[in-house]
Amino acid sequence: MKATITWKEDAMFEGISGSGHSVVMDGPENAGGKNRGVRPMEMLLLGVGTCSAFDVVNILKKSRQDVTDCITEVEAVRVDAVPAVFEKIHLHFKVSGKVLDPAKVQRAVDLSASKYCSASIMLGRAGVEMTHDFSIEEAK
C-alpha cells in the first residue's frame, strides 16, 4: 500500500490513496488549522469503523441474512498526555434487516473483531482496548 500526503497551507493537507482517492485533512483553529477537513485521528476512527462495518455486512450477507442497513458509531478515549494516543475504542453496530438472527449478527461482529478487520486488530495489538456491541432494528 502507498499514500501521498501533500501540505496545502496552514495545517491543511491532502492525502491521496494508492487507489487514487483524495481526502482533505486539517487541524483545529487552536492548532493553526481552519477546520476545513477531517483531523488525522478522526480519520483513524473512520477507517476502523468502516473496516469493521464492511466485514459485518459481508459476513451477514454470506450468512443469508437480509441486512438492509448498518450504521457504525465509534467512540474513542485518548490519553491525557502527548502523544494523545487512543486508549479505548468502542464500536456499536446498528444493524437493520428483516428477521435478522441475533446469533448471526453476534458472530459477524466477533469475526470482524477477532479475525478479519485489520485496522481493529492492529490497534488492539498496539494496546488500544477495543470493544464492540450491536443492536438490531427490524426493517419495514
Give the residues covered by each predicted segment.
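Extended beta-strand/beta-hairpin segments
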Residues: 1-46, 57-140
